[in-house]
């Protein structure tokens, strides 16, 4: 066991364009091989596409999309008497945001559009309208938690 104690939580700086820490976290989540500038460009272009298609402020659409993706419940494996049970637990707020951003980026990458900007913009728009693969992932997670409700008393 390490003796140094818990690692201090690093705070991210808000991005220059929207002055939002959430946007910075999304940029960092999308970043590949340390190319933050490229990630920033992709996100801002995706936000331009969102603005073009909806006529709304892209931050509002993004926040709505993220709210529709973030899970409230998830299942965690708990070993009791030689058997593994999937125990439903509430998701902490920080983890909710992290999972929401992760699912948004992962399912945007799996889409079929030509550029990442289009993929991300379409995934954000779908999620804002309660559709798309990332929202389906949240629904599946909630279904798993609901199905294993009987094991809720194993919570720790």
Curated annotation (Swiss-Prot):
The UniProt entry's GO biological process terms, in alphabetical order, are:
ribosomal small subunit assembly; translation
Q: Which domain of life is it from?
A: Bacteria
Instruction: State any single GO MF term.
Output: structural constituent of ribosome
* Swiss-Prot/TrEMBL keywords: Ribonucleoprotein, Ribosomal protein, RNA-binding, rRNA-binding, tRNA-binding
Q: Which GO terms describe its cellular component?
A: cytosolic small ribosomal subunit; ribosome
Q: Which InterPro entries match?
A: Ribosomal_uS7 (IPR000235), Ribosomal_uS7_bac/org-type (IPR005717), Ribosomal_uS7_CS (IPR020606), Ribosomal_uS7_dom (IPR023798), Ribosomal_uS7_dom_sf (IPR036823)
Q: What exactly does this protein do?
A: One of the primary rRNA binding proteins, it binds directly to 16S rRNA where it nucleates assembly of the head domain of the 30S subunit. Is located at the subunit interface close to the decoding center, probably blocks exit of the E-site tRNA.
Q: How does it assemble?
A: Part of the 30S ribosomal subunit. Contacts proteins S9 and S11.
What's this protein's family per the entry? Answer: Belongs to the universal ribosomal protein uS7 family.
Protein known as = Small ribosomal subunit protein uS7
Q: What is the lineage of its organism?
A: Bacteria, Bacillati, Bacillota, Bacilli, Bacillales
